[in-house]
From Swiss-Prot:
Signal peptide: none annotated. Its main location: cytoplasm. This is Histidine--tRNA ligase. It comes from Streptococcus pyogenes serotype M18 (strain MGAS8232). The lineage of its organism: Bacteria, Bacillati, Bacillota, Bacilli, Lactobacillales. PROSITE patterns: AA_TRNA_LIGASE_II. Keywords: Aminoacyl-tRNA synthetase, ATP-binding, Cytoplasm, Ligase, Nucleotide-binding, Protein biosynthesis. Coiled coil: none annotated.
């Protein structure tokens, strides 16, 4: 049997990993500017953490969960999304306590797992960056969080991003709209896809989210949830729109957007961009004011978003964005003969300890092959070290581009490589 990675997973090799690290670094820096701290939760949770919060009737729970019973007969699932585990942690670790500064702002970066058909930008193991803010019902929190995602896209150079916005209102507003939608869709039930016929019974708002052609036709003239918002929900949504306009963040109202998770209320949003003529959601989130209470904590407002790293990197590639990744090496040591082996290790280690990137030959290759490696690594400086150099206690270091060179003692290399580098590269 040929051993291969499981379907829907990928190996992220060093050349690509550098791009991932850059995007993650920009995200961390951006979130830090907004006073967010990192949280790390387990990759697997008790099944009920996900099923009861995300919703028993959602596609995630009914079709996509990687769940199993462990050796203690506990029902476990690999996490399919990030919000529920973070809320569980918020409650379990009593981050709602009075001594904890509010709002509590958390971000996470990690793997999620969903059993779905692999396609471009969507895998069974995928990586998500997400944020959650607890403790503020102020609509300014909604806008700040949306603005933070927008800020991140600006930093990464992503173009043609459109903010899609909607409100699900309060639970009362949502219940009134739910009934109106049932009344509208029931007469055309037979025209819906089989999935949406099931959704009509279990969670009719999800019919609006369907990608099936017949469902899209059916909901074209469906009532708008915005017509069912109560006074408080309307005021919240108007405040969100006003503040987005004050920050010069353009948006479009999308009344058919409901999000695939059951815990949202009031503001929901997606950032959508165009890739090769197709619309692609690169970030989505919203407000969830009941979820902390659902997990046994005090009633606490929450707002957050998630974005898929694979999809974000695909957009970066398709838009031709060049990430400023440092690929050059500071110095390469070409090693000639067994007599130079030990000293080469000593020198390369001393250079690294001074903060420089360095590599040496370990394979005993001919000098031409070693110089080719130096070029492949884009080494700025190259040093040749043989037995005669070891005996003399010094060696020649050259600029790999200008060919300028200087003879330097081992003592200087081991204690003052910064001056040597500056002399040759200035």
């Amino acid at each position: 049997m040929k051993l291969q990675k499981p379907k829907g997973t990928q190996d992220i090799l060093p050349g690509d990993a550098a791009k991932w690290q850059y995007v993650e670094s920009v995200a961390r820096d951006t979130f830090s500017q907004y006073n967010y701290g990192e949280i790390r939760t387990p990759m697997f949770e008790h099944y009920e953490v996900i099923s009861r919060s995300v919703g028993d009737t959602t596609d995630i729970v009914t079709k996509e969960m990687y769940d199993f019973y462990d050796k203690g007969d506990r029902h476990i699932t690999l996490r399919p999304e990030g919000t529920a585990p973070v809320v569980r942690s918020y409650v379990e670790n009593k981050l709602f306590a009075p001594e904890v500064q509010k709002p509590v702002k958390l971000y996470y970066i990690g793997s999620m797992f969903r059993y779905e058909r692999p396609q471009a930008g969507r895998l069974r193991e995928f990586h998500q960056i997400g944020v959650e803010c607890f403790g503020a019902a102020n609509p300014a929190t909604d806008v700040e969080t949306i603005a933070m995602a927008y800020h991140l896209f600006e930093k990464l150079g992503i173009k043609d991003v459109t903010l899609h916005l909607n409100s699900l209102g309060s639970p009362e507003s949502r219940a009134a709209y739910r009934q109106a939608l049932i009344d509208y869709l029931t007469p055309m039930r037979d025209q819906l896809s089989k999935d949406s016929q099931r959704r009509l019974d279990e969670n009719p708002l999800r019919v609006l989210d369907s990608k099936e052609k017949e469902d899209k036709l059916a909901v074209e003239k469906a009532p708008s949830i915005l017509d069912y918002l109560d006074e408080e929900s309307q005021a919240h949504f108007e405040a969100v729109k006003d503040m987005l306009e004050a920050l010069n963040i353009p948006y479009v109202i999308d009344t058919n957007m409901v999000r695939g998770l059951d815990y949202y209320n009031h503001t929901i949003f997606e950032f959508i961009t165009s890739v090769e003529g197709s619309d692609l959601t690169i970030c989505a989130g919203g407000r969830y004011d009941s979820l902390v209470g659902y997990f046994g904590g005090p009633e606490t407002p929450g707002f957050g978003f998630g974005l898929g790293l694979e999809r974000l990197l695909m957009v970066i590639e398709k838009q031709g964005i060049t990430l400023p990744i440092e690929t050059e090496m500071d110095v390469y040591l070409a090693v000639l003969g067994d007599g130079a082996n030990s000293k080469a290790l000593e020198l390369v280690q001393a250079i690294r300890r001074q903060g420089f990137t360095a590599e040496r030959d370990y394979l005993g290759r001919k000098i031409k092959a070693q110089f080719k490696s130096a070029d492949t690594f884009k080494a700025k400086l190259v040093m040749t070290l043989g037995e005669s150099e070891v005996e003399a206690g010094k060696a020649v270091i050259k600029n790999n581009r200008s060919r300028q060179e200087v003879e330097v003692s081992f003592e200087d290399m081991m204690t003052n490589f910064a001056n040597i580098s500056e002399q040759l590269l200035s």
